[in-house]
Every structure is written in C-alpha cells, then in structure tokens.
C-alpha cells in the first residue's frame, strides 16, 4: 500500500507541474544532471507517463536542467526505423523516442546529452509543431579513432591514439577500436593539420592498412604496411569505416519542426537526417567541435544535415558545420527505377541504393515525372499516382519495391527495357541556407537537388576540401533527384576550396548531374527557364587554383559581379585549368566580374 501511495504522489507532483503551466520539469522523473548514472530507463518511463497524461494537441515543454546526462543502450527504447542514406540494419536503440506529438518542446537549457555504445540519440516521428532547443548531443566514445602520427617513413607509420580512444590488437592482428557493445577495425581515414584542423592538402580518403600492427610501447603502435609520405609527424588522422547506422537526430513524417541552438558534436551517421517532413527550421543548429580547445578534430561520420524527400520549406541559418565527413547540407528526393511495365498505367518500381529503402516513397495523388537514366532527359509528361502499394512486403516499412498505378497512360517510350526513373514532384522543398559557416570538412560544402527556389547567401565556405556548392542529380548511382530550376547564390565567401579531390569536385561551384551518355543528350537537365535558372552573383572567391565554376547540362546560368582573388596558399594541381568549364550548356552569361589576376578563361565543350 505504501508503494502505491508513493507512486501516486510522484506522478501527481510531476503532472501538477505541467497541468497549470504546460511545463514538465524532468527532474521530477529522476532525470538529474551530473550523476553519471544510466538515465535511459528513467527517460523511457518519463516519456510514457507524460504521454499518457497529455491530450493530443496540448502544448507541453519537457524542461531539463543544464548539465550532463548519460544514456546507455540498456533500458533505452528499441525501434525498427528505415532511415534514408543510412545503413538499414535493425533494430535501432533510441535514447529519446519522440513519436506522435503535437506542440511538444524539448528544452535542454544547456543540457549535454552524452550517449554510450551504439545508439540513435533522438528521433521525432509523425509529429507537428514541435521544437527542439538548447541542448547538445555527443558520445562518450566515438566510433572514429583519432590518432597522431609520431613517425612516418619507409618502414611504416608509428602512431599514438588519442587519450579517449579504447583500442587493442584483435585476433587477426589488426588495430581495433572498441566501446560499449561495439568494435571496429578501420583501414581508412582522413588527415588533419595539427594546428589548423584543416584537411591535409591532397590527401583525400586515406588507405591505412593495419596488417601486422604492433604495440611498440604503451599506447603507441607501429603499422608496417601503412606508408604515406604525405603524413608528417604531428598529423592527426581520423581512422574510420564507412558504416553509418544512425544519425544524431532523426526526423520522419513531421510537420513544422524547429531546432534552435542545438549542437551535435558526434554521431555515427549524419548529424540530422530528415525524411518526408514538411517545413523545417534550423536556427543556430550546429555540427561542431566543443570550441577551439576541443582535442577532437572530427564531428560526424557523414553529412552534418541531410533532407530526403521533404517538402514545404527548409530554412537553415546561423549554423556552424565543421569536421564532418561529408556535406554540411544535402537536399534531394529519391528516384525509383522502373523494373517492369505491367500495362499502360502500371509499373513495378524499386529503390536502388542499399542505404535508401524501407520508407514511404509517395501517396495517392502525388505528381510525378519520368527521366531516362542514360541521358537524364525527361520523357513523357507529368502524371499522378492513382495507387501505390508495396510489392515485396506486406507493409511500406522495409519495402524496396512498389506497384504503382498512374492516373494517365504512360508514354510509349517508358519501358523496362532501358533505364527509367520516377521522380516524386510532390515531395520537393524550397531551401533557404544563410549566414552559416562551413569549414574543415571532407568532400563538399553543400549539395542541392530540388526544382524549387533555393537561396544560398552570406555563408562562409572555409577550406571545404572539395567543391563548396554542388548542384547534382543522379539516376544511376545514388538515385538522388532532381533538377535545379531556380537557384540564387549570392554574397558568400569562399576560401580555398578544392584542396582535395572527391566525387563531383570539378570547381569551387560545380553543377554536375551524373549523365552517362551526355553525347546523346538533346535537352538540358538543370535550369530550363531561360538564363535565370541559376544565378551566382556578388560572391568573393579566394583560391589557390584555377577552376571557379564547372557547369554541365544547364539551360540558364548567370555568373556576375563576383570577385576572384588568386593566392599562393597551396600549389595549384587541379586537372581543370580554366576558370570556367562548360559542357552542353545554353543561355550562359559571365559578366562584370573582377579577376585580380586577369584570368577569365572559359573552356566550352
């Protein structure tokens, strides 16, 4: 009887706090900072209790106190999630499983959420008008192993792991990092300059063979097969695999979501992955280090932010993105490939990339169009989905194939004898990306593939290593839609992009759709609305190399009123020796720019 009375009083105290003010003080559920205990069980109980006492639609704030909170896999939630552009291994262990909320705010008030093992820190699904603010996400033991080069020569490389890295030599003789419930034997890496934390010039993705590694003194290892003259003593290498099981924050099927003053310091996948969401605002959302004195050199295993098949508006501003292993932002949809044409209205279509399937592709009434994969040309007119059903599963969850019936007859050219993709036009967002800093990261700065208005302004792109801005589109490898029709890039500053080579890194700004048969392409992929399809104006470029703009298959491009300043910070090396390289383009204007060295060279092909 006493226990029943105690539990009743505990719940009454917690609920009464929010019943009047709609604020739940998480301390009342035992979620107290700086205890270093595993708070996963208490968090799950708190979320269940609060949800059971809140009417759907009530505005509720979960209020944490500032300080450190630890969450381990034991006692955490377990979910089956199919997350775009991540490894589709299930189940996922989830710290904050926030599902089916309206008007929810999670306010950390400076809380530092620390996760252990292999977890998805926070998910928000099927929710409306929700806000996440004032907290950070990190892991006690990242799955990337940071090491410092001590010696590098013909006999191999000697290195020292960072103090927090748990490591050993495994039974196969490989260097292995490990943590709570996981282990990893990385043989790839990214090299950083010790003092600047920039990627080392012309190193790109390193091969770091670890066969026969020996521990030559306590926590000092020698890898005889790892030989690389570019890696001088003092160089810091982030040893990594390409495994990406979960992002730091996962948003799916949400509407009107806001993230404010949220920092992701590490995640084994992307910092933020949003799919099938409508209207997302990021204000001071960052994927970043813990300041200048942070001993780490890396943040996330993949992109900082990634938006797959979203709609409405993506508004991202005032963020800091650094040290991540891919783009600061990537916006795209997903092509399905037609595998069978059953009749004039019906096809079997399939997700093609192994990291993109299992989530909803479309619903009845969605507008679609068709693209020929080889030339990336639109074929036939627009159509609408009359019915869409999973073909290889009983439910959408986990499905790779769909049986799709269209409202109008299919064009006779659209067959399963050659490659055709289907693009869902109803799930494309408008994008505003402004006042952000992107620096010291792998691969690219930003990537946009949406036909709706995209504005990129007042950002600083500082040593992004590859292309700073990429406009892509690919129905052959990544299967990421689509064409860019209305892009404005203005008042940005670019500092020494292209210190390394990665995919699509043809210039500081690269308009690079993946077109296997460009020779036979008659139409154009990007643009299409006259010369104002993509406008690049009033930007400032500082570069040590030649290529500023690469453009392929675009109708409508303006490059004007930009300043290009040549420096000697690094030796020029890029294979593209022209300021501008244009392949299969039309309606291009390059005018009123200031080239301090006078080089305005244009290569047209």
Curated annotation (Swiss-Prot):
Report the Gene3D superfamilies cross-referenced here: Single-stranded right-handed beta-helix, Pectin lyase-like (2.160.20.10)
Q: What are the transmembrane regions?
A: none
Q: Where are the PbH1 repeats?
A: 428-450, 451-473, 484-538
> Which positions carry the signal peptide feature in this UniProt record?
1-19
- Any GO MF annotation of the entry: alpha-galactosidase activity
Q: Does the keyword Transmembrane helix apply?
A: no
Please state the Enzyme Commission number of this protein: 3.2.1.n1, 3.2.1.n2, 3.2.1.22
Reactions the enzyme catalyzes: Hydrolysis of terminal, non-reducing branched (1->3)-alpha-D-galactosidic residues, producing free D-galactose; Hydrolysis of terminal, non-reducing linear (1->3)-alpha-D-galactosidic residues, producing free D-galactose; Hydrolysis of terminal, non-reducing alpha-D-galactose residues in alpha-D-galactosides, including galactose oligosaccharides, galactomannans and galactolipids
What Pfam families does UniProt report for this protein, alphabetically?
A: Beta-barrel_GLAA-B_I, Beta-barrel_GLAA-B_II
- Keywords in UniProt for this one? Glycosidase, Hydrolase, Repeat, Signal
Coiled coil ranges (UniProt) are none
Q: Which domain of life is it from?
A: Bacteria
This chain's function reads: Alpha-galactosidase. Removes both branched alpha-1,3-linked galactose residues of blood group B antigens and linear alpha-1,3-linked galactose structures.
UniProt lists the family membership as follows: Belongs to the glycosyl hydrolase 110 family. B subfamily.
User: What name has this protein been given in UniProt?
Assistant: Alpha-1,3-galactosidase B
Species = Phocaeicola vulgatus (strain ATCC 8482 / DSM 1447 / JCM 5826 / CCUG 4940 / NBRC 14291 / NCTC 11154) (Bacteroides vulgatus)
